[in-house]
Amino acid sequence: MNYPNGKPYRKNSAIDGGKKTAAFSNIEYGGRGMSLEKDIEHSNAFYLKSDIAVIHKKPTPVQIVNVNYPKRSKAVINEAYFRTPSTTDYNGVYQGYYIDFEAKETKNKTSFPLNNIHDHQVEHMKNAYQQKGIVFLMIRFKTLDEVYLLPYSKFEIFWKRYKDNIKKSITVDEIRKNGYHIPYQYQPRLDYLKAVDKLILDESEDRV
């Protein structure tokens, strides 16, 4: 049997129960090849669909410089620039808790540099934490393929050290000791709320 274009029909072995296609045989449970932002996006979609949590990425603020109005009913933006975010990347609600966090990736194998965290972001994290929010930094070491949740209560110690010009980064060992490892799995790939559960339990004891 041929298709209308003359090409012969071939059975789909995956549908017929034969050899699996590459899409199913090469499933990877690690995070290689996918950005941290994409992993979080997939996890948040899973949480929302499963009625577990409502967490979203905040839109990057844009400063519009030049707008053209070819018609009264239309506006064309000719020039615009992304502005430096004034807060963190993500926020939402999980089991009655306000969640607020910043997500960062680094290719560095031994430490996480602090020069790409901004003062106003840390100030926002501090304010949210003081209101009993669950605030943290999510860090992925790309080369090591490891992801950690570093609570704000621990992060602020390293941030003060950085601002005092003592050390410009947080070592991997310091993050492993003070943070929570988030292992990759199947669904969702990055189930970071399991680490959040541990953080909530620990901080509920610390804040009593």
From Swiss-Prot:
Cofactor stoichiometry and binding remark: Binds 1 Mg(2+) ion per subunit.
Listed name of the protein: Holliday junction resolvase RecU
E.C. no: 3.1.21.10
Catalytic activity: Endonucleolytic cleavage at a junction such as a reciprocal single-stranded crossover between two homologous DNA duplexes (Holliday junction)
GO biological process assignments: chromosome segregation; DNA recombination; DNA repair
Superkingdom of the organism of origin: Bacteria
Cofactor(s) it depends on: Mg(2+)
Family (UniProt): Belongs to the RecU family.
Pfam families assigned to the protein according to its UniProt record, in alphabetical order: RecU (PF03838)
Keyword Nucleotide-binding: no
UniProt-annotated binding residues for Mg(2+): T87, D89, E102, Q121
Major location (coarse): cytoplasm
Lineage: Bacteria, Bacillati, Bacillota, Bacilli, Bacillales
Stretches that traverse the bilayer: none
Cellular component terms (Gene Ontology): cytoplasm
Site residues (Transition state stabilizer), renumbered to this chain: K104
Record keywords, A-Z: Cytoplasm, DNA damage, DNA recombination, DNA repair, Endonuclease, Hydrolase, Magnesium, Metal-binding, Nuclease
This protein's record includes keyword Zinc: no
